[in-house]
């Protein structure tokens, strides 16, 4: 990712934070632009990826040979029982750190 990409990602993260911190309960449940995913699922997807960037889970003993879409589902599934507040908290805890990790790879 280029420095311009990092700058754009920081802007996008800030815009997402602005939106998701003001969501109502009903808005969390609305369909997102991703077919089959709610806004909640989409935020869980982003937060799980940011968490994995900062604090990766241990590698599985056996390789997992799944399509990328199914791998993303596996990251979201454990969060199905989380409250919206827990998903929001995870996003806020890891989003800026994840951008910093990606930025450090450019140095």
What are these regions (language model features)?
Residues 1-14, 36:
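Short, extreme N-terminal leader segments that mark the start of a protein/domain
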Residues 1-4, 49-107:
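Short, helix-capping/interhelical loops that line the mouth of catalytic, cofactor-
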Residues 17-38, 59, 101-107:
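Helix-loop segments that flank and shape redox-cofactor active sites
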Residues 10, 14-17, 92, 96:
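Generic alpha-helical structural signal
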Residues 38-39, 83:
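Short, structural beta-strand-to-alpha-helix junction motif
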Residues 45:
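Histidine-centered divalent metal-coordination motifs
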